[in-house]
């Protein structure tokens, strides 16, 4: 609860257009605590819901770590299909989550600032996609509860602006007043700076 309330303070400077959240109770609760009394539309979207772990759902991590599939999940997640009728593959999980976020980005528009409240594997898989990493490398990413990761999507490519930020100032993410600018032929700045 304290983490979500701290996140509320950090997000206060951002004009959120919407919040898209996994429908699981814990993410809905985090969303409510994160927003407090802000009047921001909240959208439940199963596509950013937890990985469908099938028969693994609800089992303790100590027990799962002894399952031979655990090593595969850690080393080669792209080949994992979770057992059971409702288990999914990790590539399916990544595809549905990335597709959902890209669809929300298109729906809300290029200037929208919105939050997606989701789960560790979902967030890591979206970050891996945005970084151009193979899914087998996504376990190299770390995502803490109530951390902030920021991906800016442009017509050419995504830009990863932050990962696993647990205390930094987020005010820089707020849009600055529009300035008259030259038309750029690319969305990336030579030299990696903010450009002129």
Where are these regions (language model features)?
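Generic structural signal for well-ordered alpha-helical scaffold segments
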Residues: 5-12, 94, 98-106, 127
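Generic beta-sheet signal
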Residues: 112-121
């Amino acid at each position: 609860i304290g983490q979500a309330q701290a996140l509320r303070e950090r997000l206060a400077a951002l004009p959120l257009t919407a919040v898209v959240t996994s429908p699981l109770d814990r993410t809905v609760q985090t969303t409510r605590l994160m927003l407090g009394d802000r009047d921001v539309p909240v959208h439940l979207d199963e596509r950013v819901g937890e990985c469908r772990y099938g028969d693994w759902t609800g089992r303790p991590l100590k027990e799962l770590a002894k399952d031979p599939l655990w090593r595969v999940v850690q080393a080669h997640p792209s080949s994992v299909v979770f057992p059971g009728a409702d288990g999914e593959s990790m590539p399916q999980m990544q595809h549905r989550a990335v597709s959902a976020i890209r669809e929300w980005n298109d729906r809300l528009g290029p200037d929208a600032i919105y939050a997606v409240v989701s789960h560790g594997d979902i967030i890591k898989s979206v970050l891996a996609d945005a970084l151009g990493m193979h899914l087998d490398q996504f376990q190299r990413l770390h995502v803490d509860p109530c951390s902030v990761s920021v991906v800016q999507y442009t017509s050419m490519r995504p830009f990863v602006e932050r990962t696993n930020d647990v205390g930094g100032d987020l005010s820089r993410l707020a849009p600055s007043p529009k300035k008259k600018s030259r038309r750029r032929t690319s969305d990336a700045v030579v030299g990696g700076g903010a450009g002129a």
